[in-house]
Amino acid sequence: MRRGLALPVLETTVVSEWVDYNGHMNDAAYALVFSRAGDALMDRIGLDAAARKRTGQTLFTLQVMLHYFKEAKEGDAIAVACHLLEHDDKRMRLWLEMTAPGGERLAASEQLLISVAQAEGAARAVPWAFETKSALDALARAQSDLPHPPAAGAGIALKRKA
């Protein structure tokens, strides 16, 4: 893990099924790509399929905010990188940024996720497993110099003239 950089988690290409009547990637497709990026992150922090089966622990999404900066069109290569904004004993807040090959920002997703144990059909919040907590701590240290994204934590509102 390189210090001071967002963690690359996903590279893909915009497929025709993701393109809408406006000729660009549909808003739901962005959510799908960011969801897949979150799944890829799980593999990097000790929550891969084998660990989920062994421990019964997984992630649930509590909140998501999507930001759209520039259109992505069919055939475009896209990449998603992860900036761990903060974490505690059960939750993490991520800034996932989608870029074009030259680094141009296309979209971002801020996500609040929680550690959950699934046992006997019931889900309940639980502290991170040791391996996951260690991975999150290491990621936080490696990214401690990254600037906080200006839009992170922002809500939605219409700007009003004073």
Can you annotate each of these PLM segments?
Residues 3, 40-44, 59-64:
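Short catalytic/metal-binding and nucleic-acid-binding patches
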Residues 12-20:
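Short polar catalytic/cofactor-binding loops
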Residues 48-57, 152-155:
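Short secondary-structure junction/hinge motifs that connect adjacent elements
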